[in-house]
A protein has these predicted regions:
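Transmembrane alpha-helices and adjacent helix-loop boundaries
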Residues: 1-198
């Protein structure tokens, strides 16, 4: 969102949405980890649409305060829901490193090159996380070098001038807000499935 000149402090709220949705889908609905994480990112994006409609018209400190308030509201909601186990949190979330360790045992990688299966699982988890990071960076670079990125830069420089040039400021601010929420939701889902507890 900062690419379009918006200071949003709601990333923790969107990360929470992604983490809880991904964890609940993996725990309660027995969905694969990847599916739960992606759905968590999509739900965070949907929440961004709902929150973004009124808040993207705000600027500066007012937007920062509104999005910070959203993060606190999300925290209080998740601490008081039965499905999230309240203040006790969710434990036993399927772990990405553990799943990869199971695959290492299944494919008989235990002891290969002097590395045990647990280390293989952790190594593969790190490689997957780095690949996701590279993919997100590549997407952000691609967006910045596109027509959308130029619109973001124009809005960041002067949103009134950008609007006079025919750029739909609210549309592009919403787009930046939704993209940021999706990335935060994916990050939250990954966090939940790495730490096994939220």
């Amino acid at each position: 969102t900062l690419a379009s000149g918006q200071l949003s402090l709601g990333a923790a709220g969107f990360m929470s949405v992604g983490a809880y949705v991904g964890a609940i889908l993996s725990l309660k609905a027995d969905l694969p980890i990847v599916v739960g994480i992606i759905i968590g990112g999509l739900v965070a994006s949907l929440v961004a649409v709902i929150i973004g409609l009124p808040t993207t018209r705000l600027k500066g400190l007012y937007l920062a305060i509104a999005t910070l308030g959203f993060g606190e509201v999300v925290r209080v909601i998740f601490l008081n829901l039965d499905i999230t186990n309240g203040a006790l949190g969710l434990s036993g979330i399927p772990s990405i490193p553990q799943e990869l360790t199971n695959y290492a045992y299944e494919f008989d990688l235990d002891g290969l090159m002097g590395i045990d299966a647990v280390a293989w699982g952790n190594l593969m988890a790190i490689i997957i996380l780095l690949a996701i990071l590279v993919l997100i960076i590549a997407c952000c670079v691609r967006i910045n070098n596109s027509r959308v990125g130029r619109a973001f830069a124009a809005i960041k420089a002067d949103d009134h001038a950008a609007e006079l040039m025919g750029i739909n400021v609210v549309y592009y601010k919403m787009m930046a807000f939704i993209i940021g929420a999706f990335i935060a939701g994916i990050g939250g889902g990954l966090y939940a499935h790495i730490t096994n507890f939220i």
